[in-house]
Amino acid sequence: GIASRGLGDVYKRQDMNFKAEDIINKNFDGFFLSNGPGDPKKVYENIKPELNKLLNKKIPTFGICLGHQILSLAFNASTARMEKGHRGGNHPVKNLETNKVEITSQNHGFVVLDENFPSNLQITHKSLFDKTIDGMKANDQPLFSVQYHPESSPGPHDSRYLFDEFINLMEKNAG
């Protein structure tokens, strides 16, 4: 994960009461929106004003699981409860940019919908089980997310490259 990449200062909030100014004023190189429980629509509504302030600053951003769903909602995508959630390891996901298959760990009961997917986002990953959206990136800012847990990577570390991509995005944005 991020900690194993030797990053310096990390600002951590474990609730939804963060203030965008706390992150912006400290000039952090990136913003990581992690996983968590709950309905993404309800969580997004609680953090929408602060999250939008961050997104407007175009700070490099990486989201996983619930973070993926929330970022998708911030760009006007839709989410829905799944009939059967994705739980456990060994979920094959196709990276549409490389055409490689990654074996992922997943634990979610909501999904980002293909229907009316925003044109300012690009789908980057799809589940090979049910073709649901498992990754996206923004076309006009340094932001990407995945539905699964790259920090778990039950395969031979199939998805850990995403943390390197996030670091590269932060370095590129800083320079």
Residue positions per predicted region:
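Short acidic loop-to-helix transition motifs that present clustered carboxylates
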Residues: R13-D22, D39-P40
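Cysteine-nucleophile active-site neighborhood
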Residues: I24-D114, G155-L169
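Single conserved hydrophobic/aromatic residue that forms the stacking wall/gate
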Residues: G1-Y11
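Hydrophobic residues at beta-strand termini and immediately following loops
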Residues: Q14, M82, T124-K126, M136, ...
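Catalytic beta-strand/loop cores that center a nucleophilic Ser/Cys/Thr
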Residues: N99-P142
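A glycine-centered loop/beta-turn motif at secondary-structure junctions
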Residues: G135-G175
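Pre-Walker A segment
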Residues: R5, E21-K26
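Acyltransferase
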Residues: D9, R13, F117-N120
